[in-house]
A protein has these predicted regions:
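Short, glycine- and small/hydrophobic-rich beta-strand elements in well-ordered beta-sheets
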Residues: 30-52, 56-58
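An amphipathic, aromatic/His-enriched active-site/gating alpha helix that lines ligand/cofactor pockets
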Residues: 36, 57-95
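Short intrinsically disordered coil segments
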Residues: 23, 69-71, 115-119
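Glycine-rich beta-strand-turn "strand-cap" elements at beta-sheet edges
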Residues: 45-46, 78-125
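Short amphipathic alpha-helical segments
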Residues: 14-39
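Intrinsically disordered, low-complexity acidic/polar segments
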Residues: 15, 52, 62-64
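Active-site-flanking beta-strand signature of metal-NTP-handling nucleotidyl enzymes
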Residues: 4-9
Length: 125
């Protein structure tokens, strides 16, 4: 499973409504995301409108393409596009900026555990 992080910018005057919409995402949208391979998907929103998303999926391009083929995603993206800054001509799911991962605790611990000469006792504090 691959981990992806992305950013978008929500209009500061629409933060409250954006949050409210995400407290009751349409059930068919939730099912479409799951069916398209989106897992452990979270959104974080700062007071200045910076939106940070995190998702795990085997392949983000495939997961995005699967969502693009659903009618519910088109409706959701159309509904939500009013909340974002500088989307141009597309929807949010076409315009987010990916952020490269630079650290993952479990990956580094796993590499340490598999180094020659390391024992499991060395990792208990």
């Amino acid at each position: 499973m691959n981990r992806y992080c992305f950013t978008l910018r929500v209009r500061p005057d629409r933060l409250g409504e954006y949050k409210a919409r995400h407290q009751a995402v349409w059930p068919e949208m939730l099912e479409a995301l799951r069916g398209a391979g989106w897992s452990n998907y979270s959104l974080f929103l700062s007071d200045d409108g910076l939106l940070i998303g995190y998702v795990e999926t085997p392949d983000l391009d495939s997961a995005r393409a699967a969502m693009a083929r659903t009618t519910v995603n088109g409706r959701w993206q159309q509904e939500m596009s009013q909340f974002f800054v500088d989307l141009g001509h597309g929807h949010a799911d076409d315009n987010f900026a990916l952020i490269p991962e630079v650290f993952h605790l479990e990956d580094q611990l796993a590499r340490l555990r598999h180094r020659p000469g390391n024992t499991e006792e060395a990792f208990h504090v």
